[in-house]
Design a protein with these regions (language model features):
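N-terminal polyanion-binding entry modules of DNA glycosylases/AP lyases
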Residues: 3, 17-252, 317-319, 323-334, ...
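Intrinsic disorder/low-complexity segments, especially N-terminal tails and targeting/processing regions
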Residues: 9, 15-18
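Residue-level marker of regulatory loop/turn positions in helix-turn-helix DNA-binding domains and
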Residues: 164-165, 169, 251-255, 266, ...
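Surface-exposed beta-strand-to-loop junctions
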Residues: 167-170, 211-213, 275-278, 344-347
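Catalytic DNA-binding helix-loop module of base-excision-repair DNA glycosylases/AP lyases
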Residues: 176, 254-303, 364, 370
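Alpha-helix capping at helix-to-loop junctions
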Residues: 198, 236-244, 265, 279, ...
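Phosphate-backbone recognition surface of nucleic-acid-processing proteins
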Residues: 280-355
Length: 383
């Protein structure tokens, strides 16, 4: 379970990858533009947890062919990128403070690892290994459960039919899970779904049916007053066919930053939440949340073992006036004199600069940093 800001860091474990919802991505354009927003915490459901089977409007007897769902093209990585760390045992030992732990000379991934994950995620981790071969052991230690190809394939088959409904439910479920334990979130979600038993839509929660619920009914399942407002607003937007977030054409034509803008207009959804939605629901391969505590801690541990990488980043940033100006601002995470942290936060400017070396697969790099952020790596993904 992932919590932000409201729980002790010792108990903060980034396991978003076990509780989100995956479906086929949509091909989009590459324009840019970004609006900032406040962070909120959320957890995304597994594909098997999403209610499906919405009653469709009766047809007039004329069937229309269903458009084929297009998978998002995997971005092309730069040709022959210079490695951050050379792909040799001697170099890994020299440039890091860890043993290489059986890094194969050809940097291949185990077949079972390849079979488990989606093609896009595999390309992402391959690129990360190409940039830094010393990441190989941490990558292959466990599967990244949020990027399993089976769940991806099952959802891809009917993605366009239920996509907007699933987008709505994923966002509502993220609000339910904000600032509560995993057990509490599961309990509240179960009670929320039980509200719809016996309704016109059967047991399937929908945006329209949610709007028909009174505030008292929604409060009765354990939602706070602010969360009730968030759920109602998200449902109001997704019940309106004229809204951008209910249009598949919008998701196909908009850039990820433009989608962030629309998501951040929803009550209860901030930029951090929008980025998690982009990674785990839309399967974006180049998302990076530098303001995430797990990312900050993972980067600190990554650089603690690779001090020359930080030194090189500082030298490169020194030649960039805009980044030098940004360095004058206080970093998102910093240690106070009485801090009990066992790790030293790195300034956001350096975190972003180093992450840029893993474009266009920063989502995979972020998952690796989350894994590195765990004090006891053996408990990873075994909650």
């Amino acid at each position: 379970m992932l919590f932000k800001h409201l729980v002790p860091e010792a108990n903060l474990v980034h396991h978003v990858s076990q509780r989100y919802f995956i479906m086929g991505a949509i091909t989009r354009s590459n324009k840019s533009g970004l609006k900032t927003a406040e962070n909120t915490s959320q957890v995304y459901p597994l594909a098997t947890d999403i209610p499906t089977g919405i009653k469709k409007p009766k047809s007039n007897g004329v069937s229309k062919p269903k458009p084929k769902t297009k998978s998002k093209p995997i971005p092309k990585a730069p040709k022959n990128p210079s490695p951050i760390i050379d792909a040799t045992d001697a170099s890994i030992k020299k440039q890091t403070k860890v043993e290489p732990l059986e890094v194969p000379l050809d940097l291949t991934l185990p077949q079972e690892f390849l079979d488990y994950h989606t093609p896009g995620f595999i390309e992402g981790v391959k690129y990360c290994i190409e940039r830094d071969p010393s990441l190989h052991p941490i990558i292959v230690r466990e599967n990244f459960t949020g990027f399993g190809s089976k769940a991806f394939d099952e959802k891809l088959a009917k993605a366009d039919d239920d996509r907007i409904h699933l987008y709505w439910y994923s966002l509502v479920r993220s609000v339910i899970a904000q600032q509560v334990s995993g057990a509490a979130a599961k309990s509240i979600e179960g009670k929320f779904k039980s509200l719809f038993t016996g309704g016109d839509d059967g047991v399937i929660p929908t945006a329209k049916a949610t709007l028909d619920m009174s505030e008292e009914q929604l409060r009765s399942v354990g939602l706070s007053r602010p969360k009730v407002k968030y759920v109602q607003h998200i449902s109001q937007v997704f019940a309106n066919s004229n809204e951008k977030l209910t249009s598949l054409d919008f998701y196909r034509s908009a850039t990820v930053d433009e989608i962030y803008n629309e998501l951040c207009k929803l009550k209860g959804i901030g930029l951090w939440s929008a980025k998690m939605f982009a990674i785990f629901t839309m399967e974006e391969l180049d998302v990076f949340a530098e303001d995430d505590l797990g990312v900050a801690r993972g980067m600190a541990k990554y650089l603690e073992q690779r001090p020359h990488v930080l030194q090189r980043a500082k030298e490169e940033v020194a030649n960039d006036d805009s980044k030098q100006t940004a360095l004058k601002k206080r970093s998102k995470f910093y240690n106070k004199l009485d801090s009990k942290r066992t790790w030293k936060p790195i300034h956001d400017v350096y975190v972003l600069h180093i992450a840029e070396k893993f474009k266009p697969f920063r989502s995979a790099f972020m998952m690796i940093l989350w894994r590195l952020s765990l004090t006891n790596i053996d408990v990873l993904d075994k909650e």
